[in-house]
Regions:
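Metalloprotease/metallohydrolase-associated module, dominated by Zn2+-dependent proteases
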Residues: 1-70, 87-168
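Active-site recognition of the HExxH zinc-binding catalytic motif
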Residues: 74-87
Length: 168
């Protein structure tokens, strides 16, 4: 299954009502193609006259792997725990510290979820084959028996091409 923004929105709304008493404002929801992170939660902390508040909360879910519906749900809940901790202002011992693990264990034990901190994705199928990208390789002879090879960034190709046309 490949997640969509609409699906993530419905998951967030349902889980917020069911497990977080509806206290989490809807964050920005994004899809990513990350290979090493199935999900991320990010926000900025802003100081106000009342104290600290979080700004621009964002939950991203990777679509790189072909995850089951249950796996996507577990990833969403994992990120929502991070969001709830950030919103509450509670200081945890680390990103996956005592508070996080307590909330995760509670959801797993009480409701039968399989939320985890790490997931081995080595055997997982990807949603699509990686795109083959063309690259421009620049080769220059510096001195006899000395060469310089480099891959040219696509954004610098036109600039490099115009400068090389000036070389006699």
């Amino acid at each position: 299954m490949t997640a969509t923004i609409d699906y993530l929105t419905s998951l967030f709304t349902r889980f917020n009502d069911d497990y977080f008493d509806g206290k989490l404002p809807l964050p920005h929801l994004r899809l990513s193609r990350a290979k090493t992170r199935l999900g991320t939660f990010s926000c900025r902390k802003k100081k106000t006259w009342r104290g600290w508040r979080i700004d621009n909360p964002t939950i991203s879910i990777s679509t790189y792997y072909d995850m089951t519906e249950r796996q996507i749900q577990n990833v969403m809940l994992h990120e929502m725990i991070h969001y709830a901790i950030a919103l509450s202002g509670v200081k945890d011992t680390s990103a996956h510290g005592v508070v996080f693990r307590g909330m995760m264990d509670n959801l797993n034990r009480k409701y039968g979820w399989e939320i985890s901190i790490r997931q081995n994705t080595r055997e997982w199928e990807t949603t699509s084959k990686p795109k083959v990208r063309q690259r421009l390789i620049l080769a220059m002879r510096l001195k006899p028996n000395r060469c310089f090879l480099t891959v040219v960034s696509p954004k610098h190709y036109s600039q490099l091409n115009s400068r090389l046309s000036l070389v006699p």
